[in-house]
Amino acid sequence: MIVVTGGAGFIGSNIVKGLNEAGEENIIVVDNLSNAEKHLNLNSLSIADYIDKDEYLQKLNKFQNVKAIFHQGACSSTTEQDGKYMMSNNYEYSKTLLNYCLENSIDFLYASSASVYGNGKAGFVEKREAEYPLNVYGFSKFAFDNYVRRVLPQVKSQVLGLRYFNVYGPQENHKGRMASVAFHLFHQLQETGKMRLFEGSGSFRRDFIHVADTVKINLHFYESKTSGIFNAGTGKARSFEDIATALQSLHGSGEIESIPFPEDLRGKYQEFTEAGLDKLRAAGYSKEFMSLEEGVQQYYEQLSATDGRFV
């Protein structure tokens, strides 16, 4: 049996799909369906059971023969200001799951984030000196990564953290403001014929990775049983304008407008990210990543055909 927390969410549901395609259907999805729209992410997937995230913690020891937990569940809002909630949901919950896995020799693969790097002045490499998060979401991930670092030398089962960079692709419809730039620009283009970018977006560059590539990385490490903390990005920073231009080309038209930069993001916004891949490659992950143009085209076609959902 495999458990996927956040399995009704964006990356989690894509991991469930990847496991299904690999022949695995004995999967428990753990999530919070307060946002009822998320059930749509599960409609076409094969799972054995669903359980609420809070109820799951209360019943941990009742589940037998669990061989791995893909821990993808978290509050992923980079603008959330309730630090107590963030640390309870992202840090304490993760520690409880990790310690349960260590006590029961269950493989534990979890979602970290490139947000731990902050402005990236010290580079985007998996080293403590490169980490200085700009918001409490990033801090919650940073704190758990450092907790993991302290226990790694003693672990006997797999403990694997992946620092996701800017992930885009199907099944993110429920994320609202936190959905990818590609998602928002597509819908702006469809609704108004225009795409709105923050002032300065020509110089904002991020490492955009298609969700299908993050699934491949997860499944690679699930098979290899490697432990550690690794970047999950493409190693190539691209501008927000590059996404708009790609969509413009696919759509055949579309103006690009500048809008004021939101005040609530000032000082908390990563203007540049680019994953260092040396550690990932050294761990045996050799697959090539989708180019931005290829990924945006694939996503454009999915959004046009199915509103970006699995069917």
Where are these regions (language model features)?
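Glycine-rich phosphate-binding loop and adjoining beta1-alpha1-beta2 segment
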Residues: V29-Y56
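NAD(P)-dependent short-chain dehydrogenase/reductase
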Residues: A122, N146-H220, A246-Q248
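A short helix->loop->beta-strand "cap" motif at the edges of active sites that frequently abuts
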Residues: E24, N104-I106
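C-terminal substrate-binding subdomain of Rossmann-fold SDR/epimerase-dehydratase oxidoreductases
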Residues: Q190-V311
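N-terminal Rossmann NAD(P)H-binding glycine-rich loop of SDR-like oxidoreductase domains
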Residues: I2-A22
